[in-house]
Amino acid sequence: MNQFEPKFTLIDTVSNQSVVLEQKQINIYLCGPTVYNDLHLGNTRPLIVFDVLQRVLQAAQYKVQFVQNITDIDDKIIKIAQQQEISEAQLCKQQITAYKSLLKKLNILPIKHLQVTDKIDKMPGYIARLVKKGFAYVSPLGNTYFSVSQLPQYGILANRVVETIEDEATDKRNKLDFVLWKQTTAGVKWNSPWGWGRPGWHVECAFLIDYSFKDQLTIHGGGVDLKFPHHENENAMHMALYDKPLTQHWMHIGHLMFENQKMSKSLQNFLLAVDFLTIHDFRILRWLFYQKHYYHPLDLSQSLIEQACSDIKRIQKAVNVCRTWFVYSEQSAIPAPKQFEPVFKALLNNLNFANAITHIWKLVKQINHDVSKQNLSGLKEHLSHLEWALNILGIGFKSIHTKLNVQLIKKWASLRKNGQLDKADEVRQKLIKKGLL
C-alpha cells in the first residue's frame, strides 16, 4: 500500500495554472483591514478561506509564516476620527481591538499582524530605492509617484491593456501613476526626503511584504476586487526593484453577493460580521463560505443561511449522540480525532470544499447508522474521522458532556438495563432537550 504524502496543489488565480507546493516553507501575505469601522461579512470570507489554508498546510507538515497588515492611517480614518472628535490613534485602537476580538470569535488561527504606522519610518527608504532606479518622480506639488510607463510589465495581473482610472490628482504624468508619498496637511504626518506627509496605500503593503519576506513570498491573497489596482501596483513596485514578480502564487477570493449585488459599504447592502455573530454561531458563517469554491462569487440569501443553520445542527447532533453512546456503553474514553484522508485530499486540492463536504455528510450518515445498530467499533472510527474533518475546517465542537450530563446518561443507561422503561424515557427526554440524543 502506497504511503500518502500530503502536498498542496494550488490553482494560481492570475496565471490559472495548477502548481504543487514542493517547498516546505510557505510564506503568506493576506491584505488586511483599514480600521475605520467594523468588518462586514464580505470582509470575513478571505480571512476564513486563508485560515483553512493555514490549517491544511500545517496538517501537511508545511512550515507556515502568515503575515497580515493592519492599515491604521488613511483618509477615511482621519474623516471618521474628526466626526467622532477623537484622534486617529484612539479610533484605530478601538477598531483593532474589535478586529482581533472578531478573529477569535471566528476561530481564526493566530496571524502575525503588522500595523502600518509602526513601520512608516522605514518606508521612505523603500520609496527612495524606486526613485533611485528611475521608477518614481516628484510632482510639482511635491507628491512622489510611481511611473507606470517605466515598467513594460504593468497590467500583467489585470491581464489586459490597462486604460485610465478615475483619480482626483492633477499633478501626475500619467493617470495610472500611483502615489508613493503624498504631502498633506490633514491628520498625522511623518517626515521624509519629500517633505511631511504619509505613504500611499499601495506602497504600504508592498513595503510590508518586502520587510517580512524580501523576494521570498509564496502566496499573496485578498479579495478579487484588490486584483486591480492594488495588487497590480504592489507587483509593479516589486518588479521595479527585483525584476521578478512579487509572489510565486496569487489567491483571490470571490465577492460575497447579496441579492445578486456585491456586498459592500459603498452600496450600503452589507451586514456587519459582529451583528451576524450575535444571531448565529460562527460555524454557520464558516459553513456558508464552504458552499462555493473560494474564487467564485457567493450569493448570500436568507434561505442559504437557514440551510447552513440546519446543516450545522445535524452535524452537531451526530457528534453529540455519538459521544453519548460512548458514555452509555461505558467506554473509557471518547476517541481522539484521526486524520481522514478523503477530506484531507479534497482540501489539499486547491481547497475543494465541495468534495470535502460530500465526505463529511458520508461520515454523518455512517455515524447515524452505527448509532442505530449500536456499532461501537464503527462509531469509534467514524467519530474520530469526523472530529478531524471538522477541526481542519475550523468548526469543531466542544464537548457538552459535562460531569452532570455524564451522570444523567449513566442514569438513563441504568434505568434501561433494569427494565424501568418509563423512568428511562423521562431521562431520555431530558437528554434530547440538552442535545445529547
UniProtKB/Swiss-Prot annotation:
Subunit structure: Monomer.
Species of provenance: Mycoplasma pneumoniae (strain ATCC 29342 / M129 / Subtype 1) (Mycoplasmoides pneumoniae)
InterPro entries assigned: Cys-tRNA-ligase, Cys-tRNA-synt_Ia_DALR, Cys-tRNA/MSH_ligase, Rossmann-like_a/b/a_fold, tRNA-synt_1_cat_dom, tRNAsynth_Ia_anticodon-bd
Cofactor (UniProt): Zn(2+)
Official protein name in the record: Cysteine--tRNA ligase
E.C. code: 6.1.1.16
Short motif ('HIGH' region): ranges: 33-43
UniProt family annotation: Belongs to the class-I aminoacyl-tRNA synthetase family.
Superkingdom in the source lineage: Bacteria
Primary enzyme class: ligase
GO cellular component: cytosol
Main location: cytoplasm
Residues reported to bind Zn(2+): C31, C205, H230, E234
Gene that encodes the chain: cysS
Keyword tags: Aminoacyl-tRNA synthetase, ATP-binding, Cytoplasm, Ligase, Metal-binding, Nucleotide-binding, Protein biosynthesis, Zinc
Any one biological process term the GO annotation gives: cysteinyl-tRNA aminoacylation
Cofactor note as given: Binds 1 zinc ion per subunit.
